[in-house]
């Protein structure tokens, strides 16, 4: 038996700082736990492909998708709402994470 594990190293670049729960350490902790439990032996690792706009629109309305793309910063950080912030790598990381869900 094998289990698909779909992710991408670029997701580690969505780093909103130590104060924010969305940080690369969470992905590292998941990988460490998979290794510690031996589950990594049955994983088939795959790099995620980014979700397409059409795939995003299956879960989000076009106004929201357009807003996220428009607010993606070239530098620094921007806040989309009280819980969601973006850095220059966040859009790509989000597209890869959504793509992983579609692939899975």
Which role does the model predict for each range below?
Residues 1-104:
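HDAC/HDAC-like amidohydrolase catalytic core signature
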């Amino acid at each position: 038996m094998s289990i698909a594990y779909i992710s991408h190293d670029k997701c580690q670049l969505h780093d909103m700082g130590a104060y924010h729960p969305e940080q690369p350490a969470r992905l590292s902790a998941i990988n460490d736990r998979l290794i510690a439990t031996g589950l990594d032996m049955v994983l088939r690792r795959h790099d995620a492909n980014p979700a397409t706009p059409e795939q995003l629109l299956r879960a989000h309305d076009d106004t929201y998708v357009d807003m996220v793309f428009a607010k993606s910063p070239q530098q620094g950080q921007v806040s989309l709402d009280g819980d969601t912030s973006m850095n220059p790598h966040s859009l790509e990381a989000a597209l890869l994470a959504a793509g992983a869900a579609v692939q899975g």
